[in-house]
Amino acid sequence: MRMLLHLSLLALGAAYVYAIPTEIPTSALVKETLALLSTHRTLLIANETLRIPVPVHKNHQLCTEEIFQGIGTLESQTVQGGTVERLFKNLSLIKKYIDGQKKKCGEERRRVNQFLDYLQEFLGVMNTEWIIES
């Protein structure tokens, strides 16, 4: 009986340890990355001959591929080491997060009514959060 109690407590402890999130929340990661970007801006602009394509419109969520290509270019031209490495590591984690979220865009066949609800929500976000150019 005593052994069963010990095993139960051990299992409960193991479950607790594995249930604690070990990753930093994405919102905190983004805040930290913004601070690092501000801190290392001078170092990052040291190469004034480097040209990186910048998306024209302001709907940033549509340009994630271009943004991360630019980050890759910047990283390959920046001297690595020290604290700037943390910036690029964070940016890589943010990209993984976005890529994971994009996988949720996978198609699932649903009824027309459900699609129209989704379309209405999409247009509502577009109407309130996107910068619509005339």
Swiss-Prot record:
Gene3D superfamilies xrefs: 1.20.1250.10
Signal peptide limits: 1-19
GO molecular function terms listed in the Swiss-Prot or TrEMBL record: cytokine activity; growth factor activity; interleukin-5 receptor binding
Signal keyword on record: yes
One term under GO cellular component: extracellular region
UniProt entry keywords in alphabetical sequence: Cytokine, Disulfide bond, Glycoprotein, Growth factor, Secreted, Signal
Subcellular location: Secreted
Domain of life: Eukaryota
Any single biological process term in GO: positive regulation of podosome assembly
Entries under SUPFAM superfamilies matching the protein: 4-helical cytokines (SSF47266)
InterPro entries (alphabetical): 4_helix_cytokine-like_core, IL-5
Not glycosylated, annotated site positions: N90
Residues carrying sugar: T22, N47
Expression tissues: Present in peripheral blood mononuclear cells.
Recorded family membership: Belongs to the IL-5 family.
Functional description taken from the UniProt entry: Homodimeric cytokine expressed predominantly by T-lymphocytes and NK cells that plays an important role in the survival, differentiation, and chemotaxis of eosinophils. Also acts on activated and resting B-cells to induce immunoglobulin production, growth, and differentiation. Mechanistically, exerts its biological effects through a receptor composed of IL5RA subunit and the cytokine receptor common subunit beta/CSF2RB.
Listed name of the protein: Interleukin-5
Native source organism of the sequence: Homo sapiens
Lineage: Eukaryota, Metazoa, Chordata, Craniata, Vertebrata
